């Protein structure tokens, strides 16, 4: 498969994507604070508004979570800029393509090229400025998406569909003979 648009032509992949992204988008968000070995629910936190009422001026929390989960599904990870500059925190999804750098102290920096009104064309973010979600991961740092994990299976399914389409398009009429050990009549 060459990417999400190609993979979405596979019915099982499209169904899995739709089911997973819709389910994740509907999930309620609860925040907890660790206090030693116990967790306590947090009722007031700057991120609660963005996660439960309005992610940004263009997205509801449902849409934001669906977009982020979709990026995770396809590419293994999703990034959103945590904008703390206004009276309310905003979460702005970032493009999929990025470069990661580490500084001498071990801090991670991510460079994105964006085409949005809110951000510069190319911008570098420290990991503390980002919400970083991963689909599957082997090391906790990088995500692995369905396109990478199931590349061969998706490709096989798409090629099978293509073959079957050509087979029937060329006038194929599969037929065969079925043999049974007894005589068939109207009663059976």
Where are these regions (language model features)?
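Structured, contiguous alpha/beta core segments that scaffold functional sites
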Residues: 1-188
């Amino acid at each position: 498969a060459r990417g999400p648009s190609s993979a979405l032509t596979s019915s099982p992949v499209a169904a899995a994507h739709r089911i997973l992204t819709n389910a994740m988008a509907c999930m309620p968000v609860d925040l907890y604070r660790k206090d030693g070995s116990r967790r306590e629910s947090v009722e007031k936190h700057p991120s609660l508004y963005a996660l439960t009422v309005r992610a940004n001026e263009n997205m509801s929390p449902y849409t934001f979570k669906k977009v982020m989960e979709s990026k995770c599904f396809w590419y293994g990870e999703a990034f959103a800029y945590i904008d703390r500059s206004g009276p309310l925190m905003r979460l702005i999804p970032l493009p999929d393509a990025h470069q990661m750098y580490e500084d001498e102290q071990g801090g991670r920096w991510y460079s994105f090229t964006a085409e949005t009104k809110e951000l510069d064309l190319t911008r570098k973010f420290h990991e503390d400025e980002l919400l970083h979600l991963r689909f599957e991961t082997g090391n906790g740092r990088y995500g692995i998406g369905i396109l990478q994990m199931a590349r061969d299976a998706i490709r096989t399914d798409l090629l099978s569909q293509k073959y079957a389409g050509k087979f029937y398009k060329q006038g194929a009429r599969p037929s065969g003979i079925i043999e049974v050990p007894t005589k068939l009549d109207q009663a059976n």
